[in-house]
């Protein structure tokens, strides 16, 4: 018989019997002093933590970021210097589904990256799409509510989704991507990733540049049709997890080409679009993507819960040489992501091993739930405030960003006034070939099943402003799929409104 470790309680005491509860007599009731049973049941009651409010269903892996290009003239970030190799963690996800949702659903895929750099953790928290549904964070909770379950029926509501989208024309770009082939990828090895937001670079000379990050899959793109996805879900709800885990276990390491688009700081005032608008892309003809490196995933987690479910990504985690921008959605996420982790994982969530930086950490935060580092991180128990005379940690002036020029009156500006929400979706639509357009029309028609006619007509009006062919194609697909025709509900509502 081989030597095996002794089973103990969480306090370290050996357990004599893990098969039978302590009872008063063979048939008698269980005794309250059976602490082993109480401990076991209590731990089971607390095994589940709150799932993420968004992006709950996810898949993760470790890897390496290798920089092969030279953008040192734009940024001082050590992680982006030529030849740098940085360990990292990636977590992919769906947006709307809960932890038990099927993987093969039509949805945006989250693309969250944590780079363990020598200057601290750098998190890039993006999606597999370069744009998003809303541009003002005040509307983000409302949008997410439409993707979740109806409070009365507890069912997903196509009516809520299309009602919100049809009242929010800024969503057209993302909706078009979502309903296209790329809205239903076969897995996450065959998708692109995007930082989506506009970030900034700054160099040793104090010069600032605006930047967008792209991760282009080197495996090619693969997508399901709706019918194919239904068959996949009938076989397995874990198709993406199975694919990613198996590929890495078999040594088929997925790779992404890393690119950046760089815009001189003053160009932001010259572009015909707002370069900080999350519903817009930067045309590649104006700001060509620059190849800077390769991201490879090459190791599976040993424990999903501790290394993927406990992973906490936040856009607030940046390093010297990388900064933020006036992107309103980014500004809100800087706060909301870290705050969500404090709620879901605890005050000191960054002490969880998967979230710990690889460099030394020194700060004056103290006490609180989950404090496992001895009170303070200053290295001296007498230095628990700042400034102090007891060799506590001090600032590093070289990490200061260059000043950002901001002007304007404080107000709640209508973000739809003077904003063109149709040109970029039109450019995307015109890139589709005939077969891609037909699938787009069919996917939209399928997603509109059961939606009231007046909402359908409102959305069709937006599609027509993108391109008459877009509106006509969806209208025909609706008739073919559901027998939808000239809508009397919409007409009656217009008459009522006029009266």
Curated annotation (Swiss-Prot):
Swiss-Prot/TrEMBL cofactor(s): heme
Catalysis: reaction(s): 2 H2O2 = O2 + 2 H2O
GO BP of this protein: hydrogen peroxide catabolic process; response to hydrogen peroxide
Ranges of Polar residues composition bias in the record: 7-23
Organism domain of life: Bacteria
Single GO term (MF): metal ion binding
Disulfide linkage: none
Region (Disordered): 1-25
Annotated keywords: Heme, Hydrogen peroxide, Iron, Metal-binding, Oxidoreductase, Periplasm, Peroxidase
Cited InterPro entries: Catalase, Catalase_3, Catalase_clade1/3, Catalase_core, Catalase_haem_BS, Catalase_immune_responsive, Catalase_sf
Entry-linked PROSITE patterns: CATALASE_1, CATALASE_3
Active site: 55, 127
SUPFAM superfamilies: Heme-dependent catalase-like (SSF56634)
EC numbers on record: 1.11.1.6
Subcellular locations according to the entry: Periplasm
Record-stated family: Belongs to the catalase family.
Function field: Decomposes hydrogen peroxide into water and oxygen; serves to protect cells from the toxic effects of hydrogen peroxide.
Listed name of the protein: Catalase
Species the sequence originates in: Brucella suis biovar 1 (strain 1330)
């Amino acid at each position: 018989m081989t030597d095996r470790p002794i089973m103990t309680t969480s306090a370290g005491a050996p357990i004599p019997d893990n098969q039978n509860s302590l009872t008063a007599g063979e048939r008698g009731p269980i005794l309250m002093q059976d602490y082993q049973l109480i401990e076991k049941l209590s731990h089971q009651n607390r095994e589940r933590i709150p799932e993420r409010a968004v992006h709950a269903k996810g898949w993760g892996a470790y890897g390496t970021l290798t920089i092969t290009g030279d953008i040192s003239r734009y940024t001082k970030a050590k992680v982006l210097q030529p030849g740098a190799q940085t360990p990292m963690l990636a977590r992919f996800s769906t947006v709307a589904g809960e932890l038990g949702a099927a993987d093969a659903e039509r949805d945006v895929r989250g693309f969250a990256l944590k780079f363990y750099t020598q200057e601290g953790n750098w998190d890039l928290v993006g999606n597999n799409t370069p744009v998003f549904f809303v541009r003002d964070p005040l509307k983000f909770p409302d949008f997410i509510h439409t993707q979740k379950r109806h409070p009365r029926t507890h069912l997903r509501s196509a009516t809520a989704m299309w009602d919100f989208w049809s009242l929010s024309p800024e969503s057209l770009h993302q909706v078009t991507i979502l309903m296209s082939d790329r809205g239903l990828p076969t897995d996450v090895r065959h998708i692109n990733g995007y930082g989506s937001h506009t970030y900034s670079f700054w160099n040793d000379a104090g010069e600032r540049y605006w930047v967008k990050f792209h991760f282009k899959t080197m495996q090619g793109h693969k997508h399901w049709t709706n019918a194919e996805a239904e068959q996949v879900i009938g076989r397995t709800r874990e198709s993406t997890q199975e694919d990613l885990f198996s590929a890495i276990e078999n040594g088929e390491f997925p790779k992404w080409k890393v690119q950046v688009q760089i815009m001189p700081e003053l160009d932001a005032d010259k572009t015909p679009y707002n370069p900080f608008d999350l519903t817009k892309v930067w045309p590649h003809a104006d700001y060509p993507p620059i190849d800077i490196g390769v991201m490879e995933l090459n190791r599976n987690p040993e424990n999903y819960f501790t290394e993927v479910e406990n992973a906490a990504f936040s856009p607030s985690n940046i390093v010297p040489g990388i900064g933020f921008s006036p992107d309103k959605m980014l500004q809100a996420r800087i706060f909301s992501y870290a705050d969500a982790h404090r709620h879901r994982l605890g005050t000191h969530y960054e002490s969880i091993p998967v979230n710990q930086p690889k460099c030394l950490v020194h700060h004056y935060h103290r006490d609180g739930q989950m404090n496992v580092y001895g009170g303070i991180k200053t290295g001296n128990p007498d230095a628990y405030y700042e400034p102090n005379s007891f060799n506590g940690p001090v600032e590093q002036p070289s990490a200061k960003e260059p000043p950002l020029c901001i002007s304007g009156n404080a107000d709640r500006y209508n973000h739809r006034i003077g904003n063109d929400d149709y040109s970029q979706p039109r450019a995307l639509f015109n890139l589709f070939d005939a077969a891609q357009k037909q699938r787009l029309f069919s996917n939209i028609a399928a997603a509109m099943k059961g939606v009231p006619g007046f909402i359908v007509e409102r959305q069709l009006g937006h599609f027509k402003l993108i391109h008459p062919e877009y509106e006509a194609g969806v209208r025909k697909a609706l008739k073919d799929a559901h027998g939808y025709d000239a809508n009397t509900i919409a007409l009656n509502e217009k008459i009522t409104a006029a009266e």
